[in-house]
Amino acid sequence: VDPIAAQTLADRILDWREAGIGKRLNGAKAPEYRAAGYAYGPRNGAFETVEELKLVMGMTPQLFAALAPALTVYSQTPWVDPSVAPPEVLRALSGMDEGATAGLLQARAAGGSTPVVKLGHAFTITVQANGQGGLLVRRSAVVRLTGRQSAPIWVYRWD
């Protein structure tokens, strides 16, 4: 994506998430969506699913397919955990050049220490069962620990 298109899409993503009528320089709020023929406007709140990103004006199927594997809406934290973040996300972080990214990935692969960050409350749990004849069954769930005794876990997604 060229830098101008990237900045435009970034502004539109931020406008999608932020309440209020104020629009970023290259962003889009409800009037811009209507003018472009969309039957909806921005949420003006946090993304509820990664797939919702497809609704942002200017998001292409190809770009979404490239970005989606590195995104989550479940962490409920404003930061990235470098001990588990995909390489693409690490490269996008401020101050993470190729050398720093490669060093962190090597340390992770070797079981070395990585920066300690506070863990969020959302986790992906994946279970795989191998059966006879090469049968393979895999299921994943995204869950959140609530800290409440009456409902200790919320299931966000079950695949």
Model-found features: residue ranges?
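Compositionally biased linear targeting/interaction segments
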Residues: V1-D159
